[in-house]
Amino acid sequence: MSNLSVGQIIMDAQRMASRVKDLDALGTALLEEAENNNRLVESLRQYQDDIESLNRISNNKTNADMVNRIQQQNINSSEILKENRELKIFIEDYERAMELMMQKYREHTVSKVLDSKFSFKELYNERMWQVIREQREKINEMAAVMQLAASVDDGVVQRELQTISQLRLENETLRELLQISKQYGSSQRPIRESDHLLEEKAVQTDSTADDSADDLSISGASVENMNNNSVIQMYSSPEQPAKVAGTTNSFNTAPVHSQSETQAPSVTLETAPPGEEPLANDNNNGPAVNTTSAPPPATTSNESVEDQATVAPAT
């Protein structure tokens, strides 16, 4: 029983709490309605006061005054309406003028934009033609330089070939002279020690002549390279054309000087006259060496050729 009574008490308390909430909400609604009614009463009271003030004013004035005032207000209102119509007309005219001006401005702007547009195709073609012209000028310059270098190289090669041919001719002449001296010198006297030296020098002359030809070809190639470098420097730095011309002239004249220097004297062999008998040497085993018949060792041709081979690279 106690449990049931406690449960009933709790349920009753809940019902009472819900009823209290409902009553609170109802009281709030009643308060709001009372405030609205109060405001309505205040407005009615204000309206009543306004009506009473208007009645007092109307009672103090006659109907003629009221009519005059109404007519005056009508005139004012008609003037105001007329001004409004004029203002509307002015506004419409202004809008039409502004629309016409904006239309002209748009047309002018569009025409300017169309006129000022770049033709990318024409610009690209113009730049390509400019590049082609520049490349053509460079090619012409390179062709001129190459032509000049080729002409200089041809001149150097011709001079080198001429020098080599002259040296070969001189070498053949020296060989012939040496052969003649050997033939006609050995028939009247026996072979001496100086003849052996002469034969060895003739062999050395043959070998050194070939070496000198190789050295001359190498020196010609070095001169050709130096001429090419001088031509390139002449066209790359236009401030020193006189110096380059001087160096090329010196290189061109170098083989000519060497040519004149390589002319070796002919070998002369003196033989004993037929009436004179050769003197005996100290050991009495053969004829003595004739000092006048020995060729001068300092005037051989291989020394001059070696000197030329050493002088040519130095220049």
From Swiss-Prot:
InterPro entries: SIKE (IPR008555). The keyword Coiled coil applies. The keyword Coiled coil applies. Keywords: Coiled coil. GO terms for biological process: negative regulation of hippo signaling; positive regulation of Ras protein signal transduction. GO terms for cellular component: FAR/SIN/STRIPAK complex. Transmembrane segments: none annotated. It comes from the Eukaryota. Residues 246-269 have a biased composition (Polar residues). Residues 201-222, 238-315 are annotated as: Disordered. Residues 32-99, 156-183 form a coiled coil. Belongs to the SIKE family. This is FGFR1 oncogene partner 2 homolog. It comes from Drosophila melanogaster (Fruit fly).
